[in-house]
Design a protein with these regions (language model features):
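Conserved N-lobe ATP-binding subsite of Hanks-type protein kinase domains
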Residues: 18
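AlphaC helix of the eukaryotic protein kinase fold
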Residues: 37-60
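Activation segment signature within eukaryotic-like protein kinase domains
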Residues: 108-109
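Protein kinase catalytic-loop region centered on the HRD/HxD motif
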Residues: 114-124
């Protein structure tokens, strides 16, 4: 890898890897490179296998609102993943700096739903949708372009035999954006992502979590018992349809949520929720 990519500076660190800004010597462009950190991976071999598997999954999703995977491999230093370098800031950073305008929120919703619709159509669920995994890039002339990052916890909607049991018996994700069925070790599907999106959009409007607590167990209980901070009280200026739509996405039981991202987008656009 080092023959082609020159690591320039770290961009971010995760549980198992570090993401670097890098230069592609062959094409003369900047890219992002994720490296597995051997000092943080309990089983480096398994971590590398997971990285390559996740790269294959993400590369199957070709969409302008999902970060593109360019290359993945293994060298003498371990596993690596090369992605397009997205300029801009995360949704988390943006909300810490300034709230979204109404138009920006509308663009966020439409583009995130478009990207996740493509992912689900490819048979992939994300399972770690959160503000840190949403990049916003200013457009020339105004507006924002949205990119969804980090499919590191993603899995096929219909995983191979045995893999579903492994996923069910493990608990991964960001607790404020996890659906009740994840805490219950129950089956997950597209509607699990839809719940996370509802939490994400609520957060984008308030900079607060719909299900919260002083400790992680308290947050989990809030999800499980649906103890939600009413959006309408925090943002009485919002259209009633927007409030009801987000409440629909964050319904306690999967069967009560939209059956697909496409359905969620259609209802959002039509402004009618029966």
């Amino acid at each position: 890898m080092n023959d082609r990519y020159e690591l320039l500076a770290p961009i971010a660190e995760g549980g198992l890897g570090t993401v670097f800004r890098a230069r592609d010597r062959q094409l003369g462009r900047e890219v992002a490179v994720k490296r597995i950190r051997a000092d943080k991976a309990q089983n480096v071999g398994s971590a590398v296998e997971a990285l390559i598997r996740d790269a294959r999954q993400q590369s199957a999703i070709q969409h302008p609102n999902i970060v593109a995977v360019l290359e993945a491999g293994v060298d003498e230093e371990g596993g690596y993943l090369v992605m397009e370098l997205v300029q801009g800031e995360t949704l988390e950073d943006r909300l810490g700096r300034a709230p979204l305008s109404g138009d920006e929120f509308d663009q966020l919703v439409r583009q995130v739903l478009a990207g996740m619709s493509a992912a689900h159509a490819a048979g992939i669920i994300h399972l770690d949708l959160k503000p840190e995994n949403i990049m916003l890039t200013p457009r020339l002339g105004g507006g924002i372009h949205v990119k969804i990052l980090d499919f590191g916890l993603a899995r096929p909607v219909a995983p191979p035999d045995g893999e579903a049991d492994i996923k069910r018996n493990s608990l991964h994700g960001s607790i404020h954006f996890m659906a009740p069925e994840q805490f219950e070790r129950a089956d997950v599907d597209e509607r699990t992502d839809i719940y996370a999106l509802g939490c994400l959009f609520y957060y984008a409007l308030t900079h607060l979590h719909p299900f919260d607590g002083d400790t992680k167990p308290q947050v989990m209980v809030a999800h499980l018992y649906h103890r939600v901070n009413p959006l309408g009280k925090l943002r009485p200026d919002l259209p009633a349809h927007t409030v009801r739509w987000i409440e629909w996405l964050t319904s306690r039981h999967p069967a009560e949520r939209p059956s697909s991202v496409a359905e969620a987008l259609k209802v959002y656009e039509n402004g009618v929720l029966s």
